[in-house]
Amino acid sequence: MTIHSSDHSSDPAPWQTLATHVAFQNRWLQVLLDDVALPDNRRYEYTRLQGAGIGVGVLGFNANSEVLLEREYRHGVNQVVWQVPGGLAKADEDLQLAGLRELAEETGYAPAAITPETVRYLGMIWDNPGFSSMCSHIYAVWNLTLTGKTQRDPAEFVTLHWVTPAWLKEAVRSGEIKDRVVVAAVAYLLLNGLMKA
């Protein structure tokens, strides 16, 4: 059977939210308990996370076409992971500017100029739509130059690494890099012809 992306006639019916209770909240997220009616009219309690902001991530290249990655300990998985600079956009902040701000704060790097050739929107991914409304918008930036000192959050202990595109693709392929934003950024770049396979 061939499925056409424009044909949604066989999509499942959405759930109806009858009530929502905030079970926990801090500055980063809310844990919500939804009382929902399923398409067959059964009631169900569903736990979901709602983020405090919209995520942004930036995959940056220098003039030698090397890629800037970070290594940071992530307590959720109890590992040091490969990732791109990123964070949360502030309320009403332009997402591209939020990505560039996070890049500068975490690394001290910025593009030499902000043009359509040096800053490119790659796409948006859901972080985990099974239980969360959180998403991340991904940008690629070329011609990075060191522009200033880092201004990291107090809990950010990050090392910076310049890697080749070949190393990056192999690290994604082999599973050494597992971060969703890095994997998605590489896929977007390859699919749009912005990185050679």
Residues covered by each model-derived region:
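Conserved Nudix-box catalytic region and its N-terminal flanking loop in Nudix hydrolases
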Residues: 2-4, 11-14, 49-52, 56-101, ...
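Conserved hydrophobic/aromatic beta-strand scaffold that supports enzyme active sites
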Residues: 31-35, 59, 69, 138-140, ...
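Active-site segment of metal-dependent pyrophosphate-handling enzymes
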Residues: 50-53, 62-64, 74, 83, ...
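Acidic, metal-coordinating catalytic segment for phosphate/diphosphate chemistry
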Residues: 15-59, 63
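Nudix hydrolase/Nudix homology domain
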Residues: 2-17, 42, 80, 91, ...
